């Protein structure tokens, strides 16, 4: 796992110029507690998450968290069902590592959606480099949904 994390961090740095001086902590959470952990009060301190899941019915797509990064503790949370050999799971880890790199480099954006956009764009690019012809299908998201998840919306008022 350490070798994968280090190689992904090197790839992120080469792709973005973002420097990662220290890898994040990685924690595995039991499936029964994974969604609860993401939605907990502590996690509301700016978690960034990989959410879509193509294995769920459309109504549940947006509620299935695949992984998340908690900025306050510099921790990537993954479900205990995460598999090192599964390319889709690896790409979830990469997505969350992008959020870690963004945090360490204090990436400034107009809205949180821009952080997600960069993470998804890099996740898709990485999957394409791994030979995945249809990366959106593999991660269970279409381009329109990604646009909606990453849009900067005006504040209510």
Give the role of each language-model region.
Residues 84-86, 98-101, 109:
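Mature extracytoplasmic domains of secretory-pathway proteins
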Residues 103-110, 132:
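Surface-exposed, polar/charged faces of alpha-helical domains
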Residues 142-157:
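Short, low-complexity, Pro/Ser/Thr/Gly-rich segments in the mature regions of secreted, periplasmic
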Residues 77-93:
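Short pre-active-site segment immediately N-terminal to the catalytic Zn-binding motif
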Residues 4-8, 89-93, 115-118, 122-123:
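Stable alpha-helical elements in mature extracytoplasmic
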Residues 1-76, 82-83, 130-132:
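Auxiliary, metal-adjacent structural segments of Zn-dependent hydrolase domains
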Residues 112-145:
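Post-HExxH zinc-binding segment in Zn-dependent metallohydrolases
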Residues 91-104:
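Active-site recognition of the HExxH zinc-binding catalytic motif
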